[in-house]
Amino acid sequence: MKNFFLILLVWVYAIYGNLLSAQNGIGETTALFSKQEPIFIKLNLSVKELKKNTNDSTFMESILYYKNEMEAYDSLKIDLRARGNNRRENCYYAPLKLKLSKSVTKGTFFEGNKELKLVLPCLIESNNNDYVIKELMAYQLYEIVTPVHYKTRLVNIEFVEEKGKRTITKDLKGFLIEDVDNVAKRLNGKEIKRRILALQQDDVASIRNAFFQYLIANTDFSTTYLHNGKLLFIDKKIIPLPYDFDMSGLVDASYAVVSNIQNISLDITDVKERVYKGYKRDVLLFEQVRKEFIDNKSKMFETIDRLEKYFEDKNQFIIAKRFVNEFFEILQNDTAFKNKILDQARED
C-alpha cells in the first residue's frame, strides 16, 4: 500500500510539477532585479502633497537620485503616486507607484522597467525599518516556493521631506517590486483581470499559495476577489500571484490586524495566530506541496539568514526566524499537519 501511494505521488508530481519545469528559465530578469545588494536612492518629496494630489490615475513629477555601478549619484525623471487606500489613510508614508519612461532608463540598471512599486515603512516609529525587511523576507521566501512570483530589490532611502520652508531627512529601508507585466512577460504568461473562483484556479499553485500564506500567518488576501493578489494565465493554468504581506504575523507590524476579507469564521484575534484559508483539494497534492516546502526548508533559512545584517533590532530577526521554524514544526508533524491544515481546508 505504501508503494502504491508513492507511485501515485510520483505520478501527480510528474503531471502537476510540469508547471515548474515549464516556467524555469523562461524570459529574463531585468538588471535591476538580477542582484541582491541594496540600492541607495534619494527622494525629495512632500508627503502631504503626495497624498493630496495623486490618485490611481494622477501622478506627480519628481526626480529619483540613485547610486550607479560606479558608486556615483545619478538621477532619473519619474512620475509617482501614492498607492493603497488603507495605507494612504492610516500610514504616514504611503507606498509609491513609479512610472519610468523608456528613454530615461535606457543604459541604466532600471532599463526594462516601465512601472515599479516602492514599499516604504508605514509609520514613524521604532522597528519601522525592520517591518520592511520582514515583508521583503516574505516576498523572497515566496520566490523559493514557486517561479510565479514578484522580483524584489532592497533599497536604502534618504528621504528628504519638504515641510513648508523646512526639510526633514529620514534614513528609511524600502524595497522595489517589479510590475505584474514584467512578471507575466518573464514567465510567458498573461494577466487575468477578472475574478475567477478559487476552485477554478490551478490546484497545485493554489495549495502552494495557501501554504505560504499560512507560513507567514497572513489573513489579508483573497484569490477570488483579487485582494492583494493578481491572477496569471500560464501554460493553460490560472495561477495566483500574491503581494502586500505587511498585515501578516511574520511582519507583526504595530498596525496589523486580522482581516476577514473572505467572510469566514477565523476565530483568531492576533495576527501571529495561524489559520489555514485554502480550499479542500486532492490530498495527494497537499502531500506533494508539503514535501516541496520541507525540501526547501534549508533554502528558506538561508534566505532568512542573508537578511539578518539589515535588521536594526536583532531581536526582530530572531523572532521572525523562530516564527518560520514554528511553521515547519507543524509541517513535519503528521498529526499537526492533519489537524491544522488538512482538516481546516475550506469546502466553499
Outline where the language-model segments fall.
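Bacterial Sec-dependent N-terminal signal peptides
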Residues: 1-24
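Phosphate/dinucleotide-binding and metal-coordinating scaffold of catalytic cores
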Residues: 23-348
